[in-house]
Amino acid sequence: MAVLLRGLVGTDTQSYIDIIGLIDKDIDASVEIGFYLTTKVLLLLTNDALVITKILAIWMFVNFGLFFSKNKERIYIYTLLVMPLFFFDMYMNGLRYGVAYSFAILAYDQQIKKNNLRFLILIALAISFHISSIILIALLFANYLRNINGKSLFIIAAIVGAFTFFFKDRILLKLMQYSSIESPGALSGIMPLLIFILTVGLVVVSAKKQSVLFLMCVLCFAEILSFIMSRYSYMGMRIQFIIILVLFCKLPELIYFRLQAFLVMFFISLLCFTGRYRNMADEFGNGPSPFMPYHYYWEVK
């Protein structure tokens, strides 16, 4: 309800309203093709840009629900970890990457079920909404790299190569946009790094099997690189949160859900919530659509 009843709430909400306005005028707006086409369809139903952002948020909510409602362990993860860290950011702010990541984790589920057609469709949808979903997809399947053969490697290289060729202009544009955004501050990347370290600690004390070692090494290496990058560019911090989301999604496969695990998760949950709240409080009243103070849609002037 907080998402549906909100007015201009969320740092990027006004930016999305402006983007939707450009799309309504048939202007490219420098967004991914999936988001562009979806917005064009939604504009046939309503010309209220704020309503369109809420429809996208509902779509995202349904996708995440389909993934995390599969078993009780995933429900625990969604409630204790995903919601405190990502709820406000995705549902009320970063709609494009939120929808993209929701498609990416659904694709992961379909690949586990060996449903290759649905997997490819969902991968295409994820990438068409936000280019950074490629990183999420790659890390979700990182533990399969140990068993990859030459044929699979060739297919992956061909798909990545074809995608890069056809969308090279958009990829370069995104890289330029992110690289131009400087690190928010001296402590940038510290909060996601701390959350990652605590979650790795959770895996260490509650791991189901030794085979998690390879995946954890890959994620730790990626986290170190992205943390270093976050000192200089916003892109690094974005990748840090992608890595955390991957780790959260994989936890039901990695750990036993015993009392000690729940205690650690509860502590991480508090850290996630307080970190997000501090960021919102620091931006109180700043910009055209800050998170705080919260207001309802009928209060929009």
Each language-model region and where it sits:
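Transmembrane-helix signature of polytopic, membrane-embedded enzymes
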Residues: 65-85
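Membrane-interface alpha helices of multi-pass inner-membrane proteins
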Residues: 87-89, 118-142, 222-229
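Alpha-helical transmembrane segments and terminal signal-anchor/GPI-anchor hydrophobic tails
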Residues: 9, 13-36, 136-247, 275-300
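Signature aromatic-anchored transmembrane alpha helix within multi-pass, membrane-resident enzymes
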Residues: 154-159, 257-274
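Loop-to-helix entry region of an early transmembrane alpha helix in multi-pass inner-membrane enzymes
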Residues: 45-59
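Short acidic/glycine- and proline-prone juxtamembrane loop motifs at membrane-interface regions
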Residues: 92-98
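Membrane-interface transmembrane helices that cradle and orient dolichyl/undecaprenyl
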Residues: 104-118
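Transmembrane signal-anchor helices characteristic of membrane glycosylation enzymes that use polyprenol
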Residues: 1-10, 268-275
